[in-house]
């Protein structure tokens, strides 16, 4: 009885063993590179400086537009019989509109830095530049060429038309300033658009530190032969463990029988 070994052992004795156990040496952890990140450079600082400058230029545009509207409206309301080319062509009206649109386009470009808005800002400021040049020549014609006003402007005993002449001279100064503002704003918006295009094309890429995936293998799955060998080796281990337990139990039973045998014979 002690020499016999069981030939079949039920699987509920030692529990279910994993199929993937003992398939070979453990594979090292796989390293996976994370997505690449952009590296900031000097283009970002230049873009921020350009945005601040563009915002200030837009504010100056809007301020000059309202001042131009105030002085132009007062000039229209006071002039009655005096022939002025600047009023015949309604320059105070369309000049104010062009300056205001250019300033609002610059402020909108700073708030929403999109390529389409930057192009619109450049176009609006170029149109404002041509409007300012046209107004500059119109006012210069009234002040210096046709000569409806007495000269010089600043005289100790001004005539009734002198204050009108001074109002038009104020519009002339605003228009002269608007020429430089429109040109500067158009150039700044164009440079911002160019910097954004260079940023998209020339930004270097640096990969992040590889990330380790512990306990996971990215290699091919094991073959059917390896899985079958692992399963048979686990079944053999279970059978050996069970047979060892049965052998120990039979030995203990045999020893107990030997100890109790003489007692039974004495009785």
From Swiss-Prot:
What GO terms fall under cellular component here? membrane
Which regions of this chain are Extracellular-facing, per the record's topological domains?
78-83, 140-168
Keyword presence, Transmembrane = yes
Instruction: Write out the topological domains of type Cytoplasmic.
Output: 1-56, 105-118, 190-267
Keyword annotations of the record:
Membrane, Receptor, Transmembrane, Transmembrane helix
Alphabetized Pfam families for the sequence = CD20 (PF04103)
Tissue spec: Expressed in thymus, kidney, colon, brain and testis. Expressed also by various hematopoietic and lymphoblastoid cell lines.
- UniProt function note: May be involved in signal transduction as a component of a multimeric receptor complex.
In the UniProt record, does the keyword 4Fe-4S occur? Answer: no
**Protein name (database record):** Membrane-spanning 4-domains subfamily A member 10
Coiled-coil residue spans: none
Annotated TM spans: 57-77, 84-104, 119-139, 169-189
Subcellular location per UniProt equals:
Membrane
- Membrane topology for this entry? Multi-pass membrane protein
Q: Give the family per the record.
A: Belongs to the MS4A family.
